[in-house]
């Protein structure tokens, strides 16, 4: 089982060794390190995904010139004050290990012995607490500016990708309410009141809809990608074939299987900050159940480990997961 341990980063003193399960909930008071944990875990999982689908240069690139730490700080907007000489990360993934002993030395990234046979492609998405920005700021995809790609830039990009699938002919029924659908009308975000057959721009929707709608839509879209072809550039495909053909004159069934695992998404990993935002307890429950169900439906379609990791302040989210666990054990 994959694990992670984080010490002396931001509010975190020592997480201990935490096993990574398919559904994880990090609950606690504000400013206790929940988001810090989520962001570091997400970055380590992304690092593993990059190495699994890339060529030999990926490890070398991130184990020199402090690139691992610099990239993590830049993407997740960590301040320098979060780190000290005592900061450390120990991540043991499915196919690699990452060890950061301090901020002055490069990380060590090692492939596990079974790397070549186990490696696979996975779809990751970090859905931040600021997700309602895509609803409350018009044309945010055109107005948001960042000197470098960061978590918000990436989120806005992924939202644009996800919402394209949900048109008037194929709307997304929102799980946290029983009377609203999401529709992308030529790039405009609309919600339809089903009982009244009335369209409302998301800009004018309630705060609960503005917060939960992007989460609901993106979770549905990305869990639906498992088992489908991944977007792979011609350059990456050529490098993959060259690496295998460089070892042998012809492709074996094992090599073809490994290539196939890279060409299709074998799992999905969702990292969600505060899914409860602006939602009534009953709506929190419905949204949580839908997220778990979407993950469960995606799992049989791939061979990798799918994950749903959430941070929350809400006892209702915790209670819902406890009930689901109790029901699973009862079965």
PLM region spans:
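Bergerat-fold GHKL/Histidine-kinase-like ATPase
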Residues: 174, 183-188, 196-199, 212
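Secondary-structure transition/turn motif
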Residues: 92-95, 103-104, 193-198, 204
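P-loop NTPase switch/coupling surface
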Residues: 1-186, 301-305, 319-331
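Switch/communication elements of ASCE P-loop NTPase nucleotide-binding domains
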Residues: 1-50, 196-331
